[in-house]
Amino acid sequence: MKFAVIQFPGSNCDLDMLHAIRDSLGEEAEYVWHAETSLAGFDAVLLPGGFSYGDYLRTGAIAKFSSIMPEVLRFAEMGKPVLGVCNGFQILTEIGLLPGALIRNNNLHFICKTVPLRVANASTMFTGLYKEGEIIQVPVAHGEGNYYCDDETLLKLKDNNQIVFTYDSVNPNGSRADIAGIVNERGNVLGMMPHPERAVEEIIGGTDGLRLFESVVKAWKEEQVNA
């Protein structure tokens, strides 16, 4: 399986993402510069964290207009896996692949620590190797991770089982309904504020994030067999 790691000016988690895929997961991964216009040959797209375009205007707002974005939209429409982490999640909401928005943390401070997450939906292509209700430990590092949506959207997310991860015990940023990660209705686009790529090795704190990537590979292989 081959992963595309999209790089924007200001990305700073692209190295971690590539390392997680190549070295911990053992799959192929390549950087794709934001000015490219093709994702041919790739099986999954990863939008990493960082501060794309310096977060000017608002987080993800300028990345929305990158040349690669029409191809990311087409990729998602084809049902292929797209994962946006932190700034990547913010970009996914800006381009309309996911509902809602990420706003300033309610304490107005940058947060960088490992937090407990509850797996709210273990039936997606990203969470197939987790158990429903399982508590995992994944780092967060953001200043604008406070997920917001209106009441109608929140009800829809709950009804469609689109809430994949929630903060457990303590909500670090004020996100509505403790939301840490959501998928689109089709289930092939996941946006999450915590960084699974930083939780892939025991030596740096644990491997709870690795199963997310392993789940994607498992789902992809099953799809190839059934194709």
From Swiss-Prot:
Active site as annotated: 86 (nucleophile), 195, 197
NCBIfam families, sorted: FGAM_synth_I, PRK03619.1
InterPro entries for this protein: Class_I_gatase-like (IPR029062), PRibForGlyAmidine_synth_PurQ (IPR010075)
Species of the source: Listeria monocytogenes serotype 4b (strain CLIP80459)
Alphabetic keyword roster: ATP-binding, Cytoplasm, Glutamine amidotransferase, Hydrolase, Ligase, Nucleotide-binding, Purine biosynthesis
Keyword Ligase: yes
Catalysed reactions, semicolon-separated: N(2)-formyl-N(1)-(5-phospho-beta-D-ribosyl)glycinamide + L-glutamine + ATP + H2O = 2-formamido-N(1)-(5-O-phospho-beta-D-ribosyl)acetamidine + L-glutamate + ADP + phosphate + H(+); L-glutamine + H2O = L-glutamate + NH4(+)
GO molecular function annotations of the record: ATP binding; glutaminase activity; phosphoribosylformylglycinamidine synthase activity
Gene Ontology cellular-component terms listed: cytoplasm
Function description: Part of the phosphoribosylformylglycinamidine synthase complex involved in the purines biosynthetic pathway. Catalyzes the ATP-dependent conversion of formylglycinamide ribonucleotide (FGAR) and glutamine to yield formylglycinamidine ribonucleotide (FGAM) and glutamate. The FGAM synthase complex is composed of three subunits. PurQ produces an ammonia molecule by converting glutamine to glutamate. PurL transfers the ammonia molecule to FGAR to form FGAM in an ATP-dependent manner.
SMART domains: GATase_5
Name listed for the protein in its UniProt record: Phosphoribosylformylglycinamidine synthase subunit PurQ
Compartments, record wording: Cytoplasm
Pathway, per record: Purine metabolism; IMP biosynthesis via de novo pathway; 5-amino-1-(5-phospho-D-ribosyl)imidazole from N(2)-formyl-N(1)-(5-phospho-D-ribosyl)glycinamide: step 1/2
EC number: 6.3.5.3, 3.5.1.2
Span of domain Glutamine amidotransferase type-1: 2-226
Subunit architecture: Part of the FGAM synthase complex composed of 1 PurL, 1 PurQ and 2 PurS subunits.
GO biological processes: 'de novo' IMP biosynthetic process
Top-level taxonomy: Bacteria, Bacillati, Bacillota, Bacilli, Bacillales
A Pfam cross-reference name: GATase_5
Gene3D superfamilies from the UniProt entry: 3.40.50.880
